[in-house]
Amino acid sequence: MKVFAVISALFMTVAANAGKPDLPDSIYVGGQLQHVQGIALDQEKGCMYMSFTSRFLKVDMNGRILASIDRIQGHLGAMTFNHQDRKVYASLECKDDEIGQNIAKKLNVGIVSESRFYIAIIDVDKMTSLNMDPENNDV
C-alpha cells in the first residue's frame, strides 16, 4: 500500500513533466513507518523531497535516501519546492486530536493543548545526513 501511495504521488509529478526523458516513472524509497504526505521535485540537483507525516526525506532519483529530518513534531503534509531560494515549504499541523496525540506519543513529546497550523520552511541544501533533528540541526 505504501509503495502504491508513492507511485501514485509520483505519477502526478512525472505527468506534469512529461516529455522529459530523464525522469523515472516511479521511485521506491523502502519501507517507511508512515504513508507519503507530499512530494516535490528538484530537477537541478536530481532529487526529490518527500514527507512521511513526521519524517522528511531527500532522495535521489533511484530512491536512495540522501538525508532525512526525523522527529518532526506534528503532521508534515503537502509541500512545494521553490527553486529560486532552494527551500521546501510544507504544511505542518500540530493538532490536539487523536492523530496528533498518536504522533506525539510515538515521538515521546508533549501533546499540544490546542491545534496549531504552520508553514515549515526546510533549507534542503543544509540536509547533509540521515536522522537530522529539526530542533538541533540548522535545517
Each language-model region and where it sits:
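Surface-exposed loop and turn segments in beta-propeller and other repeat-based domains
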Residues: L23-V29, D125-V139
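Beta-strand-rich domains and repeat architectures in extracellular enzymes and scaffolds
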Residues: D25-S54
